[in-house]
Amino acid sequence: FDAFLKKYNNTSSHDLARLHNARVVTANESGISKHWDEERIKEITGGDNVTARHLYKSEFTFKSQIKLWCATNNLPKVDDFTHAFWRRIKVIPFNRRFEGDDRDTNMIDKLKGESSGILNRIIKGFKEWTEAGLTNLPYQVKQAVEDYRNESDVIAQFIADRITDVG
């Protein structure tokens, strides 16, 4: 996860070099009070050429093609409120916990039994995505992104808290 967070004393690109030829990159946990490196996020998710190098190796350039999936309990702080950054962000809330009687201890076997149907749904979803893109996001995702953006905008929060309309 640290490869996508701001570092104030490190400008090396070996983290980027590991993204070469990757399609999906997963990262877990950001920690509290961390900030996105918005420029790096835009660079690696924009489909542009990225210049990087492995440790003690020469630089090389590659076309980034990743989809970044970050699983975290604490969303990193954001300083960039441009459309270029926020169009890349999708917050998918996983609010349900399965404990006690809600926990299905046979879930793996059930999923194995449905594996051909699951694969068919994945293929159908992929075809829909390649034809139409992600235009119809679920309400919960749209709301979570809006909440994240609003919580990140300290200037807007200050104005809402301290400025009153007297007109």
Residue ranges and their predicted role:
Residues 1-167:
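Feature primarily recognizes SF3-like P-loop helicase cores of small DNA viruses
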